[in-house]
Amino acid sequence: MQASLDAEVLRSRLESLAASEGIERWDLGAACSTDTSVQVDRGEAKQMKGAQRSAITVRVWNERGLVGITSTSDLSDDGLSRALAGAHAASAFGNPDDIPAFSPLATAPVAELQQPLHESRTILSLLDTLRQAERELLGRHPAIQTVPYNGLAQRRSERIYLNSEGACRQQLLTTASLYLYARAEEAGRKPRSSGAVRLAYGANDLDIAGCIDEAAEGTISHLNYAPISTGRYTCVFSPEAFLDLIGAFSGMFNARAVLDGVSLSRRESLGEALAVPFLDLHDNGLHPGNIGASAFDGEGTPTRRLSLLEGGVLRSFLHSEATARAFGVAPTGHAGLGAKVSVGPDWFEVGPTPGSGGGETGLYRFAASGQRSGEGQGLVVIDSLSALHAGVKASQGSFSLPFDG
């Protein structure tokens, strides 16, 4: 396994290089990864790829407090020295109306994540595994003729955050992913498709059989399709589709979007009802199901579980250091690192409010009523949504999207 960086040694080097440049205040965020991936087409290798990536961001504050930023992929002394000098020079053009600072939680304890590191497999063994998965999926139904989109990948990644006030964060992670998307065709009918994804900490731990089963069942279930009449229907979203929709409107919870005036929410929205009174929504980047969980964000703030909605009432926004300072609260661990620090969610948890009785009635009332689609009271199950980038108007609260179901 490839040797990792030594964050303490790197911070010591940066301190020395910054001092030689006359720089007192700086920070660095680094993300490095080694990736291997394969794709197949009817049993033949379609693509076999390996890549090493490094993205290092350096910020420098000058004597007037303005910030300059630069990017590099060179962690040698010469590369870091050039990055520091470049960021220092750029700070002369920093925006005096938007000056980020160090997160006050950049040195606070972080959660200990149980993320076992796995050895990488050879690219040929990945190819054999994906070929077998494709073969099994094609054999599930005569109508399944191709698996046009597929991939098996593994990654070893490393994240670092350092600053001149002593912050020293480092995280190592290995992950693997499998993606299968089948296409079925029958004479005289439109092609139907469905897919499935599986994630794990290593390629040997992937639930390959489960991925094949889900992709096959979804594709086969879509074969017997029929049009529905125009009308009003009760729609039931699959968990994945509902999370996609929540994510498309996540600007409602984003403090950066609120400050920029591109959110449905306002500063005064905290405490207002946004949803039905039995809905709870949390952002929990530390959820055990989050294979790619990060213990800290781009500013070094620890990741934590944050309540967004309680009983349908807005309780919190997602914050970076700058937005938290503007709102007079603590950073929440949702910042990226860049010329303008971004804010984004990690892992949504959706559930009924405890004690509300929400979700207990279920959908059995529709089965008992004997209602049929087209009568204006039918039930439509939505498995997946498409074209969210084009069909969602997040700042207006509207959407029009194609779906499978």
Regions found by a protein language model. Name each.
Residues M1-G405:
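N-terminal small-residue-enriched
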